[in-house]
From Swiss-Prot:
InterPro entries: NAD(P)-bd_dom_sf (IPR036291), Prochl_reduct (IPR005979), SDR_fam (IPR002347). Gene3D superfamilies: NAD(P)-binding Rossmann-like Domain (3.40.50.720). Phototransformation of protochlorophyllide (Pchlide) to chlorophyllide (Chlide). This is Protochlorophyllide reductase, chloroplastic. Pathway: Porphyrin-containing compound metabolism; chlorophyll biosynthesis. The lineage of its organism: Eukaryota, Viridiplantae, Streptophyta, Embryophyta, Tracheophyta. It comes from Pisum sativum (Garden pea).
Length: 399
């Protein structure tokens, strides 16, 4: 997302190793569920009383465990006032950068419980502690978007937690701009498109049913876009430009064997693979809007929160790049945005009542005021969006 001039500067790369998760699904901290160990204490004077009080205690514990699933609007019997429960928001890639900043902004508002969907459980736990997140305001769950099995397991684990889903934020991304040869996901897809687009596509399709069931006043599905995939901007015209072509590479499975590892079927380019994946993200958001907004009332949106020049997305670049890129964005392009500010902007798209319009690509001006931005022809092509959707369905096993 913060890639306005990334393609013009030298860099090196390496593929990060997958984090290993040691937490058991039975660990109460994984789902934010309170322990039952103290709930059955009592001094009973008769067997009948013992049974009665035991039933009362167990009922109370069940109510506490299922607290997140209570109706969105609760009415106080004493005062007759309506109060909103906390909303539940899943954020992918919430252990660093924009994802962590957004988690912090939402958790500190007191209105949201954040589900941090991350590849590395321990990294996420340390990040949450470092950010000062109160334990009652977040839950960490394992998700590796480079594995479709992991995506399905995450959805299964989330549903077992019995938490409702009110907002889904597809934020996580990988970026290997200097890669000369493609790397691949567990399912054999080129890693940038496989992670940034296909992993999120499957996650969104599966969790759509959970969003539909939400009784929250404003349920939303948000996909983080990028200015580099929007070719009607200066940054979007920095070579190599995003271009999905006729999707022959995507239709072939992006395997690099019988088909190209690039969506357009061309020669591999790591920077272009990332940009193409962000075009897919923005096309997918619009196709979700066309297919489901009127039926479900869900708000589907994308955004570019600004150039986060210090983000970990550039962690594989050489030290010189990491040193020069932030001041270049601050003083030359004037597009620099801190992680904290970008997190507030994404949190705004999550909860601001004025940003409920569906099918919109949000951006911000220099005064940090949000506005509806225009997408390029490539990123707003309805027919291409339909084709990307249909091919993606086949690749992830939904068709």
């Amino acid at each position: 997302m913060a890639l306005q001039t990334a393609s013009m500067l030298p860099a090196s790369f390496s593929i990060p190793k997958e984090g290993k998760i040691g937490a058991s699904l039975k660990d109460s901290t994984l789902f934010g569920v309170s322990s039952l160990s103290d709930s059955l204490k009592g001094d009973f004077t008769s067997s009948a009383l013992r049974c009665k009080e035991l039933r009362q205690k167990v009922g109370a514990v069940r109510a506490e465990t299922a607290a997140p699933a209570t109706p969105a609007v609760n009415k106080s019997s004493s005062e007759g006032k309506k109060t909103l429960r906390k909303g539940n928001v899943v954020i992918t890639g919430a252990s660093s950068g924009l994802g962590l900043a957004t988690a912090k902004a939402l958790a500190e508002s007191g209105k949201w419980h954040v589900i941090m969907a991350c590849r590395d459980y321990l990294k996420a736990a340390r990040a949450a502690k470092s950010a000062g997140l109160a334990k009652e305001n977040y839950t960490i769950m394992h998700l590796d978007l480079a594995s479709l099995d992991s995506v399905r397991q995450f959805v299964d684990n989330f549903r077992r937690s019995e938490m409702p889903l009110d907002v889904l934020i597809n934020n996580a991304a990988v970026y290997f701009p200097t890669a000369k040869e493609p790397s691949f996901t567990a399912d054999g897809f080129e890693i940038s498109v496989g992670t940034n687009h296909l992993g999120h596509f499957l996650l969104s399709r599966l969790l759509l049913e959970d969003l539909k069931k939400s009784d929250y006043p404003s349920k939303r599905l948000i996909i983080v876009g990028s200015i580099t995939g929007n070719t009607n901007t200066l940054a979007g015209n920095v070579p190599p430009k995003a271009n999905l072509g006729d999707l022959r590479g995507l239709a072939g499975g992006l395997t690099g064997l019988n088909s190209s590892a690039m969506i357009d079927g061309g020669d591999f380019d790591g920077a272009k693979a990332y940009k193409d994946s962000k075009v897919c993200n923005m096309l997918t958001m619009q196709e979700f809007h066309r297919r489901y907004h009127e039926e479900t009332g869900i708000t589907f949106a994308s955004l570019y929160p600004g150039c986060i020049a210090t983000t970990g997305l550039f962690r594989e670049h050489i030290p010189l790049f990491r040193t020069l890129f932030p001041p270049f964005q601050k003083y030359i392009t004037k597009g620099y945005v801190s992680e904290e500010e970008s997190g507030k902007r994404l949190a705004q798209v999550v909860s601001d009542p004025s940003l409920t319009k569906s099918g919109v690509y949000w951006s911000w001006n220099n005064a940090s005021a949000s506005f509806e931005n225009q997408l390029s022809q490539e990123a707003s092509d309805a027919e291409k969006a339909r084709k990307v959707w249909e091919v993606s369905e086949k690749l992830v096993g939904l068709a």
